[in-house]
Curated annotation (Swiss-Prot):
Gene name, Swiss-Prot/TrEMBL: RIM101
Note: Present with 1822 molecules/cell in log phase SD medium.
Motif (YPX[LI] motif 2): 620-623
Organism expressing this protein natively: Saccharomyces cerevisiae (strain ATCC 204508 / S288c)
Disulfide bonds: none
The protein's name in its UniProt record: pH-response transcription factor pacC/RIM101
Family stated for the protein in its record: Belongs to the pacC/RIM101 family.
Bias (Polar residues): 77-94
Length: 625
């Protein structure tokens, strides 16, 4: 038995699609064709069109498709008056095919697509991102745009320099123009000053302009006074001065006596140094040693006054700076080291106020403007020279600098590379082999302190027969094992070899003398002497290389420290010059204005005494033609 409800459902299911299809075809859009073209499953429209209670859902789907509710007005009455059946397939409205169908069907109509995109949650989710991008673009434009907030001026500038000049000339004014304003009217600021240079210095707080930069840490400041305070912080922090200067422990500069007994070394230094210097070193024994005793070579070239007492920056700029050139030298470095330590010592908490006030003459104004300008030029050139030398030393080729200066190149392994065979054949003059072979693979070892002539080859016995050459080749194979990190060594023949290649400091296991002497008639003593010579050469060269690397690192550290000191002095002098320029401008303007006023008054008095007195005008009259 088939239930009656199933039969009714089948009859209504076969009849309803005709009405719905006809209604949709009348509108000019066939939904089934659209779904087939897009490759999407066609929905069961029979149950939707037959359900009267679900009519608002049909309106939603047609709006999503782009029909804008026209289907409801043109729907046939048969489709709407059909029997109401329970709704079973509501999942078709929320499935992804309908969303994609709406997106694809909206393409012909642009107006409906804009409405649907504005109401969809995806569009609302993407709109804030676009707003943020627009806000960023506006922010970039606002970074360039600067508004004048002086009494609602509202002028717009694209550079902070122009805004600052506008404030100084238009709003602050000058006394000669009778429009001088010493009170700040920027926004809510109510700062009051007494001089024009004070208000112009205060205006830098409101303008995003930082022209004064620190050469040590690359920070920028708005006023030279702020940079001065920052430089004092560099000195007091001890980033440069707290580091202990002098030779490192265990380097070539220190002797074995200093390692064994440091007290004897201190007593010997105090005996050799004059009593004034010894007393100064004893007085500062509790503080870290900043200035070690000068070497003998440097102390001979320095004057006696420079060795005995420290000096202030003002005294150096006015008295002794003309004796030096703006080029780095040990004498100038040693002299500059005597300027800053008193400032460092006396800035501590354990020093009395009298000593502190006495040492702060480094930052007192005791020089003329011309002297400060010349000193600023000197230290600026010195800083550039030292910076360029340091950059060239760091970026230049290490092989070229070492070969040109006579330094020993340091290899990555303990094995020192042998010199080229063709370069040493010119000493003997035995053969004519091209000098261009293997020039890029091996770096020649140049010893500037030791002879490189035929003295090294005098002690080597001559090799006459071919058997000796064959035995020597066999011996070199045993003495020089294969090293993977070093390139292949050149082959040495009996006619062209002048110096044996050096071995490692740790010689590998050599074969016994029986095997060496069994094949040839060579003497075992000569065999032992060859190995011993090559080993000692390698040890000496490696020690020299290590000591020279340590000395270079110490010299580089001293150079970097001195460059920092020079930069601090240069920045300080630049701040002094800028302050003096501001003061001179204000004073010169006031003096010029006073002089003009007095001259005008004198002329007016003279003209009043005469019969035909002419009234002097403050402005030029307009001439009408």
């Amino acid at each position: 038995m088939v239930p009656l409800e199933d039969l009714l459902n089948k009859e209504n299911g076969t009849a309803a699609p005709q009405h719905s299809r006809e209604s949709i075809v009348e509108n000019g859009t066939d939904v089934s064709n659209v779904t087939k073209k897009d490759g999407l499953p066609s929905p069961n429209l029979s149950k939707r069109s037959s359900d009267c209670s679900k009519r608002p859902r049909i309106r939603c789907t047609t709006e999503a498709i782009g029909l804008n509710g026209q289907e409801d007005e043109r729907m046939s009455p048969g489709s709407t008056s059909s029997s109401c059946l329970p709704y079973h397939s509501t999942s078709h409205l929320n499935t992804p095919p309908y969303d994609l169908l709406g997106a694809s069907a909206v393409s012909p109509t642009t107006s409906s697509s804009s409405d649907s995109s504005s109401s969809s949650p995806l569009a609302q989710a993407h709109n804030p991102a676009g707003d943020d991008d627009d806000a960023d673009n506006d922010g970039d434009s606002e970074d360039i745009t600067l508004y004048c907030k002086w009494d609602n001026c509202g002028m717009i500038f694209n550079q902070p320099e122009l805004l600052y000049n506008h404030l100084c000339h238009d709003h602050v004014g000058r006394k000669s123009h009778k429009n001088l304003q010493l009170n700040c009217h920027w926004g809510d600021c109510t700062t009051k000053t007494e001089k024009r240079d004070h208000i112009t210095s205060h205006l830098r707080v409101h303008v995003p302009l930082k022209p004064f930069g620190c050469s040590t840490c690359s920070k920028k400041f708005k006023r030279p006074q702020d940079l001065k305070k920052h430089l004092k912080i560099h000195l007091e922090s001890g980033g440069i001065l707290k580091r202990k200067r002098g030779p490192k422990w265990g380097s070539k500069r220190t002797s074995k006596k200093n390692k064994s007994c440091a007290s004897d070394a201190v007593s010997s230094c105090s005996a050799s140094v004059p009593s004034a210097i010894a007393g100064s070193f004893k007085s500062h024994s509790t503080s870290p040693q900043i200035l070690p005793p000068l070497p003998v070579g440097i102390s001979q070239h320095l004057p006696s006054q420079q060795q005995q007492r420290a000096i202030s920056l003002n005294q150096l700029c006015s008295d002794e700076l003309s004796q030096y050139k703006p080029v780095y030298s040990p004498q100038l470095s040693a002299r500059l080291q005597t300027i800053l330590p008193p400032l460092y010592y006396n800035n501590g908490s354990t020093v009395s106020q009298g000593a502190n006030s006495r040492s702060m003459n480094v930052y007192e104004d005791g020089c003329s403007n011309k002297t400060i300008a010349n000193a600023t030029q000197f230290f600026t050139k010195l800083s550039r020279n030292m910076t360029n030398n340091y950059i060239l030393q760091q970026s230049g080729g290490s092989t070229e600098s070492s070969s040109s200066s006579g330094r020993i190149p340091v290899a990555q392994t303990s094995y020192v590379q042998p010199p080229n065979a063709p370069s040493y054949q010119s000493v003997q003059g035995g053969s004519s082999i091209s000098a261009t072979a293997n020039t890029a693979t091996y770096v020649p070892v140049r010893l500037a302190k030791y002879p490189t002539g035929p003295s090294l080859t005098e002690h080597l016995p001559p090799l006459h027969s071919n058997t000796a050459g064959g035995v020597f080749n066999r011996q070199s194979q045993y003495a020089m094992p294969h090293y993977p990190s070093v390139r292949a060594a050149p082959s040495y023949s009996s006619s062209g070899c002048s110096i044996l290649p050096p071995l490692q400091s740790k010689i590998p296991m050599l074969p016994s003398r029986r095997t060496m002497a069994g094949g040839t008639s060579l003497k075992p003593n000569w065999e032992f002497s060859l190995n011993q010579k090559s080993c000692t050469n390698d040890i000496i060269m490696s020690k020299l290389a290590i000591e020279e690397v340590d000395d270079e690192s110490e010299i580089e550290d001293d150079f970097v420290e001195m460059l920092g000191i020079v930069n601090i002095i240069k920045d300080y002098l630049l701040c002094c010059v800028m302050e003096d320029l501001d003061d001179e401008e204000s004073e010169d303007k006031d003096e010029e204005n006073a002089f003009l006023q007095e001259s005008l008054e004198k002329l007016s008095l003279q003209n009043q005494m005469g019969t035909n007195s002419v009234r002097i005008l403050t402005k030029y009259p307009k001439i009408l033609v």
